[in-house]
Every structure is written in C-alpha cells, then in structure tokens.
Amino acid sequence: MKKFTHYIVEQIVNKYNKMFQCKMNKIPKNQSITHFKTVFDLYEKIGIQEVFFNIKPTGIYIYTTYDNSIHVETIFSNNFFLEYMCEKDAIFTLKVNAMKVRNLVNTDSLEMGIRSAQDAPLVIRMSTKTIDFEKKIAIKKTQSYKLPELIDVTPLTIKSADFLEFCKSINGGKYTLSIKTKKSEMVNGVLQRGEIIFEAENSRIVIRSETPIESEFEGEFKSEYFSSLRKVTKFNTTLKIYLCPDHPLIFETTIGPKEKDKVIVWIKSLKQMEEEYHLQKSIT
C-alpha cells in the first residue's frame, strides 16, 4: 500500500510540477490533434526548418520566417486545449521535423510539457487504448523577433476550396504572379461580388469574394510561395485576405470555430523585397 501511495504522489508531482503543460483529446467533432499536426506540415511544406515556440498563459504562439519574405504565425489559445497550464512566458526554438510524429492523428490523447526554461526538452506523450508513447524534443531558449503588423483594413473572404484549386494550378512552377482585385459593383440595383485575379504568362484564375471588395489592389509575387500554402486550406472552409499596396499580402484562417485560434501568413511582393534589398545594401 505504501509503494502504491508513493506512486500516486509521484504521478501528481510529475503532472503539475511543470512550467508548461497542455492536453488535447481526440473526440468526435474535435479536430485539435489533427490541426496541431497540420500546422507543422504547413511549415515543412513552405520550407521552414525551425520555428519559435512561444508559450504564454494565454496560449501557444508558433512563428517564423522563410527567406525573410514569407512570415507565418499560428496561435493556439489556452481554450483550444482540453487542459492548459503555463506559469510564465518563455520562447524556445525547435526543429519542425522533430514534431513529425508517426500516426499522430490516430492517437486518442496528446500531452506536452516543459519542466522549466533551463530543463528542456519538450516532452510529448501520446496515448491510445492499447499503447502509450513518449518522445523528447530538443528545444533551446531564445529571444523573439518582430513579426509584420496586421493591417487595419476590411479583409475579403474567399472559399478555402477555391484557393486550394489555385495553389494546385501552380504545380511547383516558379514564375512571377500578378495579383489584383476588381471592386464590387452595383449592376441593375444588385451588388455584384468583387473578384481577386491571379494571373501569370500562361494562366489566369479568378476567385469571387464572399464579401464586398471596396478598394483595388495590384502587386507581383513569387508563385512558389503560393504553391506551398495548400495546407492552409485544411483548417476552415473560408480564408480571409488582407490587401494593402504598401504592406505584405496577408492570409488568415481560423483553426476551428474560435476566432482566437488561427494561422496568419504574410507574403511580401517583389517590389517590397527589392526595396528592402536596396535599403540593406545602402546600410552596409
């Protein structure tokens, strides 16, 4: 009996004596574990090898940049998880491929924990009815970097399925892609949907917005950045796009029904990339 009591106490200490811990369950209509996996699939598809893993009492913030031209941030609020506890803010880096765990989406529950900022690693535990699996992932405490800002403009909304078809049409090609919008117009007293047009030398795709487009936009981008965004369509049926000529193009999608849980992608235009290049060159 004494040995059994000691075991129970040890389990309680192990569970709560951590600076960070969270848990997700695979239950009907709960896609949390699947969405968590898809986020890292998205980063890998873009070509990202390492991410900032920022834990806060309000949730987990996973972000980074690729080639300083495309930035990605994923926010999992504390309400996204079945259980969530974080004593204080801490920022770590971790390898994306380390988070690729075989058969992750087939587990019934997923737990993650960090004992302290000095006592890495990140420990992941997965359970099914017949097996428990534990993996330790090396993490390194670090400092953050500043992401681009969100812009205060009304986004246009498109269907994720339409954007997926556009991503597929690129098919790994590398060329200059022109993106422009056509404003919503009144025709015979009826407001017509606005359009966002993706155009290259040999292709043209028009997607109609679910919401009115109030201003016009035009810019040129690298096509390969968009072909890597297929996974961003897996979280929700709609996708928001923020357009401003002097700001990176922004894609935003919620992870499930809650607005706080989302993926945000910033993509710089060729003009913005060129301006930054010349600015850096003049400084050095």
Curated annotation (Swiss-Prot):
> What family classification does the UniProt entry report for this protein?
Belongs to the IIV-6 436R family.
Protein name, as recorded: Uncharacterized protein 060L
Question: Which organism's genome codes for this protein?
Answer: Invertebrate iridescent virus 3
Q: What is the lineage of its organism?
A: Viruses, Varidnaviria, Bamfordvirae, Nucleocytoviricota, Megaviricetes
